[in-house]
């Protein structure tokens, strides 16, 4: 067994909810750094590799503060034709984002990393491909009025488990990858390391 204590290095309530529903016992400790500044120190511009870099950076940051624990780091990158998009800060930005995504296919790269004692044990990214149907500006306004600021927590300004499903005509990929935590591969690793019952 690697560790008795499991820590999620993410303040995302959605990720914590997924782990709780899967029956995991864990603590939540957010990474203490400016994500955009750390991103600048990365050696890659590749969106999928960047998601791994950021997931690892978060896990390492928390792991160095809690060396005995096994730390889960996560990150999700929205990739539209190689361009990286981050979370928006306002409903106005959300409207602009949906106008950009309208009628196009983008990818969500969700990475998960495991660290202990500041050392990487595992990191991997998984991708989902999202085909957004053509959206009128009026529909986007009505959609945003209904979902309000909830969607500001989502890099794609949609929550696939709610009304966000109406934005798409096709989705290829795992549900958990879209939510931002590749749960099945993570559980396989946790069983392999005898952190959870297997």
UniProtKB/Swiss-Prot annotation:
It catalyses: N(7)-methyl-GTP + H2O = N(7)-methyl-GMP + diphosphate + H(+). Its EC number is 3.6.1.-. InterPro entries: ITPase-like_fam, Maf-like. Its cofactor is a divalent metal cation. The active site is at 75 (proton acceptor). GO terms for molecular function: nucleoside triphosphate diphosphatase activity. Keywords: Cytoplasm, Hydrolase, Nucleotide metabolism. It comes from the Bacteria. The record marks 14, 76, 161 as: Important for substrate specificity. One of its GO terms (cellular component) is cytoplasm. GO terms for biological process: nucleotide metabolic process. It is found in: Cytoplasm. The keyword Metal-binding does not apply. Pfam families: Maf. Nucleoside triphosphate pyrophosphatase that hydrolyzes 7-methyl-GTP (m(7)GTP). May have a dual role in cell division arrest and in preventing the incorporation of modified nucleotides into cellular nucleic acids. Belongs to the Maf family. YceF subfamily. This is 7-methyl-GTP pyrophosphatase. The lineage of its organism: Bacteria, Pseudomonadati, Pseudomonadota, Alphaproteobacteria, Hyphomicrobiales.
